[in-house]
């Protein structure tokens, strides 16, 4: 499937790994994901109950696309370290990566508290609700996150996609343009805005937006894919195809 319509919660990067580097033999933040899996995996196996080692290994597995294994490692770590909120947050994210949205939401609820909420976790909880079709409830979580971190583009992007998923495209565009205007907005925000603009039939404008992060031929291919998808989306066929899913931001 084209990049413009990438899967929800697109793949994580090595920037997810925030633990400190203890020696030159360990991978840095831009290291090869497979190398990180090997190094942090060795550390974890040497001391399976160590919370920091499990967290680093789980995040490395997520970055390398090994989602089920990441969830399994982090689940065991939360059992060995009950109440560790960093591990609960990572485990919840891994569950969401793996498509276990209700379980992810429940675990993430334990990773922070109403008297000390974490905007990152609120935003991820919103994405899990959106993926279960609970869009109104999801937006309450995004709104709470934005009260803590006003104007945060990753949260605004998720809020915009929530409106897209319920086919409120003008509202989705309005919110995504707020995110797009922020200098901190990343490629996901731009791709998501391009998607929403394209879904409204403004293909040339959509291509201009997405080609800022993609080679011209890839941007054109994505827009062509979107045109073809919309052309085939005929209500008279007896059913309506779902809106293509974009990239929800899961800040870590």
Model-derived regions: residue spans:
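Terminal, low-structured helical/coil segments at or just beyond the last alpha-helical repeat
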Residues: 15-19, 183, 187-189, 196-252
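Structural marker of alpha-solenoid helical repeat scaffolds
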Residues: 46, 80-81, 111-115, 148, ...
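N-terminal leader/linker segments that initiate helical-solenoid repeat arrays
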Residues: 2, 7-56, 60-64, 72, ...
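Canonical tetratricopeptide repeat
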Residues: 56, 90, 123-124, 158, ...
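Helix-start (N-cap) detector for alpha-helical repeat units in TPR-like alpha-solenoids
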Residues: 51-52, 85-86, 118-120, 135, ...
């Amino acid at each position: 499937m084209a990049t413009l319509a990438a899967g929800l919660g697109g793949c994580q990067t090595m920037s997810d790994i925030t633990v400190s580097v203890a020696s030159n033999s360990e991978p840095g933040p831009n290291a090869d994901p497979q190398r990180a899996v090997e190094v942090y995996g060795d550390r974890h196996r040497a001391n399976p109950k160590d919370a920091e080692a499990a967290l680093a290994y789980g995040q490395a597995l997520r970055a390398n696309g090994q989602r089920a294994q990441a969830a399994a490692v982090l689940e065991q770590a939360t059992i060995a370290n009950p109440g560790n909120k960093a591990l609960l947050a990572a485990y919840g994210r891994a569950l969401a990566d793996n498509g276990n949205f209700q379980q992810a939401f429940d675990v993430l609820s334990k990773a922070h508290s109403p008297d000390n909420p974490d905007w990152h976790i609120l935003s991820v909880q919103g994405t899990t609700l959106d993926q279960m079709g609970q869009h109104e409830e999801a937006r309450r979580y995004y709104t709470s996150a934005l009260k803590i971190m006003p104007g945060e583009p990753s949260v605004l992007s998720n809020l915009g996609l929530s409106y897209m998923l319920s086919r409120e495209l003008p509202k989705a565009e309005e919110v995504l343009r707020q995110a797009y205007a922020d200098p901190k907005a990343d490629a996901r925000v731009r791709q998501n805005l391009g998607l929403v603009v394209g879904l409204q039939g403004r293909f040339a404008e959509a291509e201009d937006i997405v080609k800022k992060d993609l080679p011209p031929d890839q941007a054109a291919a994505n827009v062509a894919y979107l045109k073809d998808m919309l052309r085939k989306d005929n209500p008279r066929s007896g059913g309506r195809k779902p809106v293509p899913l974009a990239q929800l931001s899961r800040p870590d």
